[in-house]
Amino acid sequence: MTNTKKSKQKNTVGNKVKKTNTNKNNNNNNNNNNKNKQNKINNKNNKNNKNNDSNNKNNNTNNKNNINIKNKNLKKVENNKSLKVISSNKNKNILNNLKKEEKVNSNDILIQQQQNREKEDITNEDDDEKYNLWNPKPTSSVSVSSSKSSKSLKTTDLQNEMSEKLKGSRFRWLNETLYTTHSKEAFKEFSEDRSLFDQYHSGFKSQVESWPINPLDLIIDDLSSIKQRKRIADLGCGEAKLAERLQHKHTIQSFDLVAVNERVTACDISNLPLKNESIDIAVFCLSLMGTNFIDFIIEAERVLVKGGLLKIAEIESRITDINAFTNEIQQHGFNLIKKNEQNQYFTLFEFSKLQKKDQQFMRSLKQYQKLKKQQATNEPVLKPCLYKKR
């Protein structure tokens, strides 16, 4: 009995030991499983960390690449800007070179034109050109050697020369306009734009300097010899030089399209602000301009006293027929006293106003002569001064 009990006790103890062993084994297994799970988790985390690291590296490389690309783009933009600056500088240089070439070419053209004009002046035998003072010849000839040396002149000198030529051209254009326009229209235009008259008289002064003699000087000398004080009307006076030089000797009234100074009264010469028979001497010095210049003669006859003098200076090249011209003046109540044809450029005339009883006969006679003359030729007695285009 005791043995059986002991064996039973041993078995129970063994079973307990087995159970504890199995429990230990189970615990060990569980621990191992947990460790394995933890290892797996750790491995996953490590992998994730590695992936994150690799991603971070990739992001860093991408950022670096992006920065490099931006830097490259910035460099390209800077390069483009520099290229633009360089190209603009090149364009400026090209433009400057072109301007220099244009200046040189214009200088060469100017010299060539001067040479061509000299050749024309030598070969041209046209009388109208010879005596037309509105297109004067150069005061001194330019040789071939001097024309070559003129290429070395400063640009400013050539520009000044070109400017003077342009002024001359402007003057001739205005001069032609005055000759081919009715005086009423000319008075309106010049009144509205004073600069036109200033340009005209600036050019006129330049032209007069090249003339061998100014007809106004001859008229002033003639009037200064008159001892008795006279009332004189300077019709188409310009700057009123006649009044300036003779105001101490005579009473002078000066009229023109524009009053350039205090001595001048602005008006249309065909409608003078003067009373009938209030003037002793009327002067037209190169001022029978306009398509209605005969109206100027009629107005002069109105304001002159009986026996009053009419003095006219006219360019020789304008007069188509000197007898026809004097007849034209005489039929409006004047008688030719004298004429001076000694100067090859100008002709000077002096007429006196007729008495009333003589005028009717003279007008009928001169009208008949005029009709006969017009049948023979249709040319006007005074040609307009036209600018010859070269």
Curated annotation (Swiss-Prot):
<feature type="binding site">
    <location>
        <position position="268"/>
    </location>
    <ligand>
        <name>S-adenosyl-L-methionine</name>
    </ligand>
</feature>
<feature type="region of interest" description="Disordered">
    <location>
        <begin position="1"/>
        <end position="85"/>
    </location>
</feature>
<feature type="binding site">
    <location>
        <position position="256"/>
    </location>
    <ligand>
        <name>S-adenosyl-L-methionine</name>
    </ligand>
</feature>
<feature type="binding site">
    <location>
        <position position="236"/>
    </location>
    <ligand>
        <name>S-adenosyl-L-methionine</name>
    </ligand>
</feature>
<protein>
    <recommendedName>
        <fullName>Ribosomal RNA-processing protein 8</fullName>
        <ecNumber>2.1.1.-</ecNumber>
    </recommendedName>
</protein>
<keyword id="KW-0156">Chromatin regulator</keyword>
<keyword id="KW-0698">rRNA processing</keyword>
<dbReference type="GO" id="GO:0033553">
    <property type="term" value="C:rDNA heterochromatin"/>
</dbReference>
<dbReference type="GO" id="GO:0008168">
    <property type="term" value="F:methyltransferase activity"/>
</dbReference>
<dbReference type="GO" id="GO:0005730">
    <property type="term" value="C:nucleolus"/>
</dbReference>
<dbReference type="InterPro" id="IPR042036">
    <property type="entry name" value="RRP8_N"/>
</dbReference>
<dbReference type="Pfam" id="PF05148">
    <property type="entry name" value="Methyltransf_8"/>
</dbReference>
<dbReference type="GO" id="GO:0006364">
    <property type="term" value="P:rRNA processing"/>
</dbReference>
<keyword id="KW-0805">Transcription regulation</keyword>
<keyword id="KW-0678">Repressor</keyword>
<keyword id="KW-0489">Methyltransferase</keyword>
<keyword id="KW-0808">Transferase</keyword>
<keyword id="KW-0804">Transcription</keyword>
<keyword id="KW-0949">S-adenosyl-L-methionine</keyword>
<feature type="region of interest" description="Disordered">
    <location>
        <begin position="106"/>
        <end position="160"/>
    </location>
</feature>
<comment type="similarity">
    <text>Belongs to the methyltransferase superfamily. RRP8 family.</text>
</comment>
<keyword id="KW-0539">Nucleus</keyword>
<dbReference type="InterPro" id="IPR007823">
    <property type="entry name" value="RRP8"/>
</dbReference>
<dbReference type="InterPro" id="IPR029063">
    <property type="entry name" value="SAM-dependent_MTases_sf"/>
</dbReference>
<dbReference type="GO" id="GO:0000183">
    <property type="term" value="P:rDNA heterochromatin formation"/>
</dbReference>
<feature type="binding site">
    <location>
        <position position="285"/>
    </location>
    <ligand>
        <name>S-adenosyl-L-methionine</name>
    </ligand>
</feature>
<dbReference type="GO" id="GO:0005677">
    <property type="term" value="C:chromatin silencing complex"/>
</dbReference>
<dbReference type="GO" id="GO:0032259">
    <property type="term" value="P:methylation"/>
</dbReference>
<feature type="compositionally biased region" description="Low complexity">
    <location>
        <begin position="140"/>
        <end position="152"/>
    </location>
</feature>
<feature type="compositionally biased region" description="Low complexity">
    <location>
        <begin position="22"/>
        <end position="71"/>
    </location>
</feature>
<dbReference type="GO" id="GO:0035064">
    <property type="term" value="F:methylated histone binding"/>
</dbReference>
<feature type="binding site">
    <location>
        <position position="201"/>
    </location>
    <ligand>
        <name>S-adenosyl-L-methionine</name>
    </ligand>
</feature>
<comment type="function">
    <text>Probable methyltransferase required to silence rDNA.</text>
</comment>
